[in-house]
Structure formats: C-alpha cells, structure tokens
Amino acid sequence: MDDFLKKDLGCLRSGDLKKCGELICEICRDLYTSGWVTGTGGGITIRSGDAIVIAPSGVQKERMELHHLFVMSLITREYMRMPALRLKPSQCTPLFLAVYTLRDAYACIHTHSQEAILLSTLFADSDHFSATGFEVLSYIPKGSKNNGFHKPTDKIKIPFINNTAHESDLHDSLQEAINLYPDTCAVIVRDHGIYCWGDTWQDTKMNTEAVEFLFQAYLRRRRLQKPE
C-alpha cells in the first residue's frame, strides 16, 4: 500500500475497530473461496460497541483491505471514517442497520449463493423455505442463540422477500420478514442471496455457514429422491 492509501486509517488504525476491519477482510476472502460471493457482490459488517465497520461497494471481495472500509456510528448514523479512495458505501447499509436495530446483532453477512437462487424457484409459491431432518439444524439458532437452537426434527422456516432493482429498496420488506419470523437468523432475497446475522461475528459466520450448508444438502437430497 502506498503512502497515499496509508495516510488516513483513522479509527481503523488500532484497537477493536481495527480487529473488526481485519476480520472483515479475512471473511470476505473466505466467502469468495466458498463461492458465496463473486466479484464485488455481497457484503459484510461487524459491530464494535456503537460503531460498525462495513465493506464498501466496488471492491472485489478477495482483494478487500483495511483501507477500503467504512466506519459508521450506530447512534448518529454518520460515517466516522470514509476511504481515501472515495469508494461508494455499500448498498446493503440500510439493511445492515435494520438488522442491528431489530435483532441487536453484532454482525451481518450478505451472500450471493447459487443455492439461494435455486431455492427461490423451488419455493416460488411459498413465503418461506422450510426443511426438517437435517443434523445441521442443531447449529442454527432460533433467532438468537439465547433462545436456543433448532433440533434436527424441527421444521425450520426461513422467509423469502422479493428482489428489487436497488439493494436499499429491500429495507422495508426485510424489516417485515424479521418481525414476522422471530425464530429466523436469516432472510432469503429471491433470485439474489441471503442476509444472515448473529450475536457475535463468530456466531454470524457459523450461522451463515450452517444455513448455506442446509441449502446445499436440501438441494442435493432432492436430486437423489426418486420422482413419485
């Protein structure tokens, strides 16, 4: 990184916000490697107290670096740090703020997985994805881990919302889905991807992995089932 890019890390220079930023860069690479995001798609935010660190729009996820990141105050909703490169804030930001407000989450991940898109077609006539009989359900919390986890015999329900031309326009329908499904830790955007959150960044990462694994297992099991 040259001196121009180094000159103003500001509140990302040290402490908890820097750790959040470093985690975001690492998780972005993990999401890319897993195939859950491509190019500049998807998004992630991690919270530290009353501040949130957010990955920007326009940067390839596997190339994300600390100096690319935004920092926002949850109280004032104003940016505490903006990148020197004049990058655009993530269009996911209003949705991240809704998750922080409604669920008191400490992180949120937005993926663009193919499985979420395929499930949108399979469940075209339903307002939610449902599944039962998978061991991975025991790793998915009922909204928050404080409420316990699903059992493999439970029938999990993860709501769908319809996609829009602009990410920020999903805000109202995301809020509605979160309120209608208190036991969910994720929302599926039809033909687009998912938003997944948790009580910590670790929980958010594990919840996302568990939900994406469930989607993959569900689709593979359907392919193995004989037609009636």
From Swiss-Prot:
Substrate binds at residue 92. Pathway: Amino-acid biosynthesis; L-methionine biosynthesis via salvage pathway; L-methionine from S-methyl-5-thio-alpha-D-ribose 1-phosphate: step 2/6. Belongs to the aldolase class II family. MtnB subfamily. SUPFAM superfamilies: AraD/HMP-PK domain-like (SSF53639). This is Methylthioribulose-1-phosphate dehydratase. It holds the Pfam family Aldolase_II. It is an enzyme of class 4 (lyase). Keywords: Amino-acid biosynthesis, Cytoplasm, Lyase, Metal-binding, Methionine biosynthesis, Nucleus, Zinc. It comes from Schizosaccharomyces pombe (strain 972 / ATCC 24843). It is found in: Cytoplasm; Nucleus. GO terms for cellular component: cytoplasm; cytosol; nucleus. Catalyzes the dehydration of methylthioribulose-1-phosphate (MTRu-1-P) into 2,3-diketo-5-methylthiopentyl-1-phosphate (DK-MTP-1-P). PANTHER family: METHYLTHIORIBULOSE-1-PHOSPHATE DEHYDRATASE. Its cofactor is Zn(2+). It catalyses: 5-(methylsulfanyl)-D-ribulose 1-phosphate = 5-methylsulfanyl-2,3-dioxopentyl phosphate + H2O. The keyword Nucleus applies. Binds 1 zinc ion per subunit. Its main location: cytoplasm. The active site is at 135 (proton donor/acceptor).
